[in-house]
Amino acid sequence: MHFAGKLAKLVNMSILPTLVVATALSLSSPDFSSNGMIPAKFTCEGASTSPAIHIGNLPAQTKSVAIIVHDPDAPMAGGFTHWVAFNIDPAADIPAAFKGGVQAMNGAGKPGYTGPCPPTGVHHYHFMVYALDTRLGLDGKAGKAELEKAMQGHILAQGDLVGLYKKSK
């Protein structure tokens, strides 16, 4: 059976309408390259402000953007979350030292971004950005788990930009 026939069979079996596939956002930063070292000014050895993130392929129907920055290498169960923010107005750029949207609870129990500060060795920091089809009804007391649950079924596209950091001292 050729491709069109197989596709028609899938549609007739009602399988296709249940598939939900988010497209990929293209993420970059003017401050560090993908899998490159994050400059100290964005860490505990500097001002601990968030780096700028450029978002490519943002779907036109995006109503809000969310970001989670997570270090899976942190020496604690589940890693450490450095930033949780959501209800960010959709735009191609999140500027450095960004304070917009709802700045929610990071792994330290504080709102907003806290820079990388690994105890030893090189850690990987995942800057995960989500394009959503809605604004979320959460407040700033939400953390990573609450945001992930609220985003279910609303992700239009997502991307992951990884930066590395190792303390100099």
Describe each region flagged by the PLM.
Residues 2-18:
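Bacterial N-terminal signal peptides that target proteins for export
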Residues 22-169:
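N-terminus-centered regions that define maturation/targeting leaders and the start
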